[in-house]
Amino acid sequence: MAPRADKKPAEKKPGAEKTPVAEKAPAEKKPRAGKKLPRDAGAAGDKKKKRAEMSVETYKIYIFRVLKHVHPDIGISSKAMGIMNSFINDIFEKLARESSRLAGYNKKPTISSREIQTAVRLVLPGELAKHAVSEGTKAVTKFTSS
């Protein structure tokens, strides 16, 4: 072990004496590059935050479009819009859970329109389910025909 220790200082001393200027120049460049990396990483972190904020999906635009289609002269507050958005998310989650359960009962890996239709009948009450099924059938027919 002693010879290894002797070899390392022997290698460093001649190298240090021969190129002290050459070592300083790259040493100065490396911290500059090192300083730029955290700034770039910080900028990338900001971009990630912006992307995360932009990826929040809501139904606010669609709620507003339907409202203006049904009642053009009526507005909606931001609090009411938030309530409607959470209501739609809740119904969507219930329908997805029920249709997944139905697909599992039938031992199918895929949720088809039949599972969705049955889930709508189970989750939504009475007349609302009938209207939802008819509108859904109409939308699927329009989609497949075009």
From Swiss-Prot:
A GO term from the CC aspect: nucleosome
Molecular function terms, GO-annotated: DNA binding; protein heterodimerization activity; structural constituent of chromatin
Pfam families: Histone
Keyword hit for Cell inner membrane: no
InterPro entries according to UniProt: Histone-fold, Histone_H2A/H2B/H3, Histone_H2B, HISTONE_H2B_site
Compositionally biased spans, kind Basic and acidic residues: 1-16
Positions of crosslink type Glycyl lysine isopeptide (Lys-Gly) (interchain with G-Cter in ubiquitin): 142
PTM: Can be acetylated to form H2BK6ac, H2BK33ac and H2BK34ac. Monoubiquitinated to form H2BK143ub1; may give a specific tag for epigenetic transcriptional activation.
Keywords per UniProt: Acetylation, Chromosome, DNA-binding, Isopeptide bond, Nucleosome core, Nucleus, Ubl conjugation
Compartments reported by the entry: Nucleus; Chromosome
Keyword Manganese listed: no
Modified residues (N6-acetyllysine): 7, 35-36
Region (Disordered): 1-52
Lineage: superkingdom: Eukaryota
Leader sequence residues: none
Record family assignment: Belongs to the histone H2B family.
Subunit architecture: The nucleosome is a histone octamer containing two molecules each of H2A, H2B, H3 and H4 assembled in one H3-H4 heterotetramer and two H2A-H2B heterodimers. The octamer wraps approximately 147 bp of DNA.
Main function: Core component of nucleosome. Nucleosomes wrap and compact DNA into chromatin, limiting DNA accessibility to the cellular machineries which require DNA as a template. Histones thereby play a central role in transcription regulation, DNA repair, DNA replication and chromosomal stability. DNA accessibility is regulated via a complex set of post-translational modifications of histones, also called histone code, and nucleosome remodeling.
Protein name: Histone H2B
Species of provenance: Nicotiana tabacum (Common tobacco)
